[in-house]
């Protein structure tokens, strides 16, 4: 492995099952793919080498937000938050993740349909290495713009 970003997981979660990454496929005609009828949450997990432990950042809040996004998009899938959390943890364990990691939990309209379809809903969880940015260690300079957005009810 050249660096921390070369890591590809061996397994992913697809539609409620752990499958090898090479076998994880969705149709190119799936509305989630062709029309971006999908929602996702990006979740970070940080490896603590002193404690030999992976810590997932605010996983409960991320899953609640994913569930809310699914409601807003009217995706027809009952998401059990505890089971989804368990699935994420299980995936990290089976991939033997011991590095800072990005977890992408997503739900989408699967199979065949148009952009107004509400089902069938597919889901996937992937994780891959994403080290902390150099700015984490060195700091970053920012400025605040004085520009203000117009009110939504202005003409």
Q: Locations of the language-model features?
A:
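Helix-start/capping segments and mature chain N-termini
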Residues: 1-76, 86-90, 114-155
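Short, acidic/charged, Gly/Pro-enriched secondary-structure junctions
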Residues: 84-113
């Amino acid at each position: 492995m050249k660096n921390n970003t070369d890591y590809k997981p061996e397994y992913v979660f697809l539609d409620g099952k752990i499958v090898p990454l090479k076998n994880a496929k969705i149709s190119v005609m799936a509305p989630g793919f062709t029309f971006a009828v999908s929602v996702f949450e990006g979740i970070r997990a940080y490896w603590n080498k002193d404690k030999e432990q992976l810590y997932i950042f605010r996983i409960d809040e991320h899953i609640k937000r994913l569930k809310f996004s699914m409601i807003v998009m009217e995706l027809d899938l009952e998401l059990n938050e505890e089971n989804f959390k368990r699935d994420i943890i299980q995936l990290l364990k089976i991939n033997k993740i011991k590095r800072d990691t990005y977890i992408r939990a997503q739900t989408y309209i699967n199979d065949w349909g148009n952009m107004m379809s509400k089902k069938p809903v597919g889901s996937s969880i992937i994780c891959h290495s994403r080290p902390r940015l150099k700015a984490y260690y060195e700091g970053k300079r920012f400025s605040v713009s004085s520009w203000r957005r117009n009110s939504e009810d202005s003409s």
